[in-house]
């Protein structure tokens, strides 16, 4: 049986920091390049965008595209609708997922494994397969053309992932802490929200961010369930900037940047909690 010798330098390269740095750099560039390109495009004029050869950086940056984005369409209204729908669906998602995850983590349920398996299975359903059933439900309940028609489906779609994430966090909290709180007079629900949830804050914040971003970015349901111009969300509103034969990419890019900024700010503010929540969830899971 023969062995192939490898040089110490090559072995240290593939197992050490250089390879990890290169891989991280590739992932970073792959993730940031589209956003940076959109930002540069939003600062260019239409003439500069179509010139050849392509210019990477805007020669004379302008904010005219941003002003036009707000004047051509009610971008502020799109932002408000998206924010309210995302905020309300996130709050509802966190409330239900906290209660569901706590029950799965603490109660001796007979079919716990089956329930967890069903949650995982539901989370894999493609959204397009749920479109018609959800539409029929919303129409039967007379909820079309309302925020509720989006808030409820967004909550349902985010619940599986958020619940599974929080189950692992709740299982890591010693039961003695809850028992001590209940001895001091807390109810079980009181112990949950006063003791367990604060200790699982990174996981709760991470689940909230995921639910918020999912609702903020969603397009298909927002387009299908709402035909009221006053209730359009940002993804649906942005498509209105393009005409039948015209695609004002600088203006569209400006609207996209405006839509990215709130989510970026949210992630920057809570980045430590999100990172700790993702890493802790991965270790506990």
UniProtKB/Swiss-Prot annotation:
Part of the ABC transporter complex SmoEFGH involved in sulfoquinovosyl glycerol (SQGro) uptake. Responsible for the translocation of the substrate across the membrane. This is Sulfoquinovosyl glycerol transport system permease protein SmoH. The keyword Transport applies. It comes from the Bacteria. It is found in: Cell inner membrane. PROSITE patterns: ABC_TM1. The complex is probably composed of two ATP-binding proteins (SmoE), two transmembrane proteins (SmoG and SmoH) and a solute-binding protein (SmoF).
